[in-house]
Design a protein with these regions (language model features):
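Patatin-like phospholipase
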Residues: 1-63, 76-189
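Gly/Ala-rich beta-loop-alpha elbow adjacent to hydrolase catalytic centers
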Residues: 66, 70
Length: 189
């Protein structure tokens, strides 16, 4: 049995296109980076290739949509030097630690350091906003009602209820969280 470094899953039309023409960056208009916490480390090498080489000569818009870790990855890719930004993110993310009994203020303070590493200055933020080819969109979950409580016990109770509601049906999560989309406005090439 042969082993392959990359497994391609595609529908019949896409698979025929890939077999006939190979992978061509111009064939892709949208890329989605899902959440997944530290699992994104498995994609780090592929990310370096995709945004350091494969998409580097792109002259048309590539819409990238990320949530959680995917949002951080893609915030790196919309910068002028995506490889360097991705390395900064990887370094910061892999070295973050929290004290055992950290409160939310300390967790927020420590987590903010990742933002400082991904965006060391306002220049990198502006690069994301002004990038003519890489158009960033982010999906976040906004806590609603009791889920947005600042008190630890209320929040823990709400998350427990949300988990239970999710077991019944994902539709019930709308009572606890709202999906919010952020995107970079403006014209695409």
């Amino acid at each position: 049995m042969s082993q392959h470094a990359l497994r391609v899953l595609a529908g019949p039309t896409a698979l025929a296109q890939i077999k006939q023409h190979g992978f061509n960056q111009a064939d892709y208009n949208v890329m989605v980076g899902a959440s997944g916490g530290p699992k994104w480390f498995c994609l780090y090498g592929l990310d370096q290739y995709l945004f350091g080489s494969f998409f580097s000569q792109r002259s048309t818009a590539l819409h990238i949509l990320g949530s959680s870790a995917g949002a951080w990855r893609f915030a790196c890719f919309a910068q002028a030097d995506p490889v360097a930004a991705s390395k900064r993110f990887c370094q910061a993310y892999s070295h973050i630690t929290y004290p055992k009994y950290a409160d939310t203020a300390l967790i927020s303070e420590i987590s903010a350091r990742i933002i400082d590493d991904v965006f060391p200055s306002a220049t990198e933020v502006q690069q994301v906003l002004d990038n003519p080819n890489i158009k960033l969109s982010l999906v976040v979950a906004k806590a609603q009602r009791i889920s947005s409580a600042r008190h630890r016990l209320l929040q823990a109770g709400a998350l427990t209820l949300a988990a239970g509601a999710n077991l019944v049906s994902r539709r019930h999560l709308r009572h606890f969280f709202e999906r919010v989309l952020f995107h970079v406005a403006g014209k695409c090439r």
